[in-house]
């Protein structure tokens, strides 16, 4: 027997003990972090055997005080994972609910929390996650840590392959988790009703998102400009010479000029030839900022002129490039004119 390809019994036992302790500790850590579904690499029942697997369940169950269940998931290509299903950590939930940080918030932080609560109340509640979404999120986290070189697309593809290879018994824990999530969602949102999007709404939503993204990317470039000194109105030099005076001309038969011609020499008509105070270059920027602040306070805290104009589609503008003399207003405006 080649000594390079063989290990002693003591070394094999040492490796098995290390993997056993790592699996037990991983389950304990995830349960303390609030996770009741833990994915372990390899086929744990086959790896440890009958007596060790019962000892594994006992060690993990000591943390929660309830028995745990193991489900082997065949990922294909002789790649196996073991799902450890544990009871929910109610102590973790109570600690999060009674966190002392919420009692020591400043008035400004409390106002920010209230605004977020109002925004969350106005925002439409999301759909409850189904069994596939719950499985994908948990498996994505596990594969990300196990194979850090994989891209998000590759991990999603592998998750889909693993899900299709699962047996009905292996999918049962994820279906139970989805049912539990649905009941919790119903408790938090009792008036929730699923309203699917209309066929044309998804396309409009994507178009609006692209326009908003374009407006967001161009807005900083528009605002990051420097006013040229040439924008400040130039003031002509003041001389000691008196202003021009006009000779009075009477309207006679020989002189066709009317008497009103004297009004054209009123100094107030030509203010640019007289000294004026220079106008600050940032006056226009400050005035525009004040105007936007008033609009934000009156309409919405997230009011944005750039994104507001980006919401309008091309069909809302009747007279655009290529329109002829017979162009008409859109149907939404025809009844008002």
From Swiss-Prot:
GO terms for molecular function: DNA-binding transcription activator activity, RNA polymerase II-specific; RNA polymerase II cis-regulatory region sequence-specific DNA binding. Residues 171-219 are annotated as: Disordered. Coiled coil: none annotated. Gene3D superfamilies: High mobility group box domain. Residues 125-193 bind DNA. Keywords: DNA-binding, Fertilization, Nucleus, Transcription, Transcription regulation. Residues 200-212 have a biased composition (Basic residues). One of its GO terms (biological process) is single fertilization. It holds the Pfam family HMG_box. Its main location: nucleus. It is found in: Nucleus. One of its GO terms (cellular component) is nucleus. This is Mating-type protein MAT-2. It comes from Cochliobolus sativus (Common root rot and spot blotch fungus).
